[in-house]
Amino acid sequence: MNNEKSNAKLRFIISGGGTGGHIFPAISIADALRRRYPECEILFVGAEGRMEMERVPRSGYEIVGLPIKGLDRKHLLSNYKVAIAVIRSMRLANKTIRNFRPDMVIGVGGYASGPTLRRAHSLGIPTLIQEQNSYAGVTNKLLSRGAHKICVAYPEMDKFFSPEKIVFTGNPVRPEIEFGHPSRSESLRFFGFEQSESPVVLVVGGSLGALTINKSITDKLGKWAESGVHLIWQTGKNYIETARKAVENHPGLKCYVNDFITRMDYAYCAADLVVSRAGACSISELCLLGKPTILVPSPNVAEDHQTKNALALSTRAAAVLIPDTEAIELLTDTALSLVRNLAELSSLSEQIRTLAKPQAADRIVDEIARIVEHEKRAN
């Protein structure tokens, strides 16, 4: 690093994506970098056609899309197209890095981070990896050898990474969740509920819709109506019409149903119990807020990592785990019983809060700052 570069404002590339579980932490890290270094420049590198290409610009950051694709494990013969996409992505990553000249590259997982961090390693640019899950993804495991530090959210990650590189920072969460503190009455009004003694259950089916969770609710809406429990239900866009028709058939049901909840801070505040998939970011938010939770891990994820995330909580009595295969039969009855068991709710809340790591984005930026300062002194 010459004097001209060392005196310039810092530049960072953040690479990865594919799902909200990668994108929301990435944006939180970018926001924390801007708080620490107001003059810094930040460029995202993601995958063409994936969620990050919309979400990142919406958050005020520039993004470059690579033509990268993931492996098709069901149709292996079609993977020659993946190989071509990887070669094209490596070339574009090389061009992007040489033009932007970053001081550091941060990888947040997902196959889009592969070409970017590999090229950064070959050019001698320092890198840091953020692993959200309790079971490390393939891309992060491959990239970890060249990384300076690996920020993790779960203990015992030394079975995947070199212990000397691991820093236990926790997962960054959305600032409105970490720092927003709405009142319960305000939150209930947002969903059309009056202040009452009735318990509230929040069911989150994901952005597209978790079919098993949604069907578990739909099939037993009569029980929800009879219970007097208030229901906040995010169905995802693929299930909303089915859910609305089902709700209309139960006029006594106190239910707010929508495909997407814009104010999750209100939803969490209003809820006495949360039903959710076991994505890393959702779990981090629930830990931070100390929310009693039933986790229904998605079976449609790499390495079954959501089950491993959920087990990290359930084995510590910090959440209830219901396998996807048992949810239709068990979920409604378990939720309606648990939400009225105040002692069990209190115990779950206490245990899940012990796993929280607040201000995770700032902890990650602390590590980035140490690496940047070390590189400056070395050059």
Swiss-Prot record:
GO molecular function: UDP-N-acetyl-D-glucosamine:N-acetylmuramoyl-L-alanyl-D-glutamyl-meso-2,6-diaminopimelyl-D-alanyl-D-alanine-diphosphoundecaprenol 4-beta-N-acetylglucosaminlytransferase activity; undecaprenyldiphospho-muramoylpentapeptide beta-N-acetylglucosaminyltransferase activity
Keyword Kinase recorded: no
Name of the protein: UDP-N-acetylglucosamine--N-acetylmuramyl-(pentapeptide) pyrophosphoryl-undecaprenol N-acetylglucosamine transferase
Binding site for UDP-N-acetyl-alpha-D-glucosamine: 19-21, 133, 174, 207, 261, 306
GO cellular component: plasma membrane
Lineage: Bacteria, Pseudomonadati, Bacteroidota, Bacteroidia, Bacteroidales
Pfam families: Glyco_tran_28_C, Glyco_transf_28
Membrane topology: Peripheral membrane protein
HAMAP family xrefs: MurG
NCBIfam families to which the protein is assigned, alphabetical: murG
Organism (species): Porphyromonas gingivalis (strain ATCC 33277 / DSM 20709 / CIP 103683 / JCM 12257 / NCTC 11834 / 2561)
Family the entry assigns: Belongs to the glycosyltransferase 28 family. MurG subfamily.
Documented EC number(s): 2.4.1.227
Catalytic reactions on record: di-trans,octa-cis-undecaprenyl diphospho-N-acetyl-alpha-D-muramoyl-L-alanyl-D-glutamyl-meso-2,6-diaminopimeloyl-D-alanyl-D-alanine + UDP-N-acetyl-alpha-D-glucosamine = di-trans,octa-cis-undecaprenyl diphospho-[N-acetyl-alpha-D-glucosaminyl-(1->4)]-N-acetyl-alpha-D-muramoyl-L-alanyl-D-glutamyl-meso-2,6-diaminopimeloyl-D-alanyl-D-alanine + UDP + H(+)
